[in-house]
């Protein structure tokens, strides 16, 4: 029986010269492992099949991800699964990103908004870039902000504003200049990878995370997400969401947590499963 360590050693030894198709087959085998399937089914129920298929699709489409430890990809995906967030990079809720030979979980600002809305405590929440000429007044003490979008002078972004209002009436507004965001970036982000990819999305996430973690109501899953972000922030930080400036009003969702997977469900992968013991998995 192959051990998790022997699998990883073999993969790392050959990975540089392994064709993409063969690397995909390796990930396919890991995802077909009964132990891995069982863990995802315990978290996602009947949606586990679709989620693990999305892991394989992401892995096969990202050459940089194929250079990382495959088990770290699965471990990062499990974090997203426990938060019930999709890992499709086009959606921008959660990311699995490569850094230093390993994959890491990262949360997009849309992911923060989604987790906030699930609490049922937020009446509205939003985060937008402020362009040159739009900001008329900002008082950081009273949080009075005046924005006139009709007075935009150019497409140059001068800052970022985040706002939320709870159903009990408590509200919070934060505005950071671009210089403040840049200072925060230099202090906490050890990699420019995400910032080079989409500076505005990273800035929006930074400001929104700051206001939610300090003033917002955090559910257990939101606290978990913040912890995961803090643990990886010094290594890499990335989002790549499409720009969205509309105010989002929450409707408490009822997520069905009673669904359990059928034992007769068809394995979505035709690769040979890798035999892994439960105690060899990279997650609890």
Swiss-Prot record:
Listed InterPro entries: RecT_fam, ssDNA_annealing_RecT
Biased composition range(s): Basic and acidic residues: 252-262, 269-284
GO molecular function, one term: DNA binding
Identification of the protein by name: Uncharacterized protein YqaK
Biological process terms in GO annotation: DNA metabolic process
Chain spans, region Disordered: 236-284
Pfam family, one: RecT
């Amino acid at each position: 029986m192959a051990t998790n360590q022997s699998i990883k050693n073999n993969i790392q030894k050959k990975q540089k010269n392994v064709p993409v198709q063969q690397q995909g087959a390796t990930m396919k085998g890991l995802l077909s492992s009964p132990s891995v399937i069982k863990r995802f089914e315990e978290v996602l129920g009947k949606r586990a099949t679709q989620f693990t298929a999305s892991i394989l699709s992401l892995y096969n489409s990202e050459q940089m991800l194929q250079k990382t430890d495959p088990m770290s990809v699965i471990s990062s995906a499990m974090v997203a699964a426990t938060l019930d967030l999709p890992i499709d990079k086009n959606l921008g809720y959660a990311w699995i990103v490569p850094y230093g030979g390993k994959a890491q979980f990262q949360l997009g600002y849309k992911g923060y908004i989604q987790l906030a809305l699930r609490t049922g405590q937020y009446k509205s929440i939003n985060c937008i870039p402020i362009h040159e000429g739009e900001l008329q007044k900002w008082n950081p003490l009273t949080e009075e902000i005046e924005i006139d979008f009709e007075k935009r002078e150019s497409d140059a972004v001068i800052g970022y504003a985040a706002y939320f209002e709870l159903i009990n009436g408590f509200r919070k507004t934060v505005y950071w200049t671009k210089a403040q965001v840049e200072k925060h970036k230099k202090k906490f982000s050890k990699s420019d990878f995400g910032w080079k990819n989409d500076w505005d999305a990273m800035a929006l996430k930074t400001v929104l995370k700051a206001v939610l973690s300090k003033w917002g109501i955090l559910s257990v899953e939101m606290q978990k997400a913040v912890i995961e972000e803090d643990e990886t922030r010094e290594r890499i930080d990335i989002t790549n969401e499409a720009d969205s400036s509309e105010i989002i009003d929450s409707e408490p969702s009822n997520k069905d947590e009673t669904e359990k997977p059928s034992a007769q469900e068809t394995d979505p992968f035709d690769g040979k499963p890798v035999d892994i013991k439960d105690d060899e998995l990279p997650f609890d």
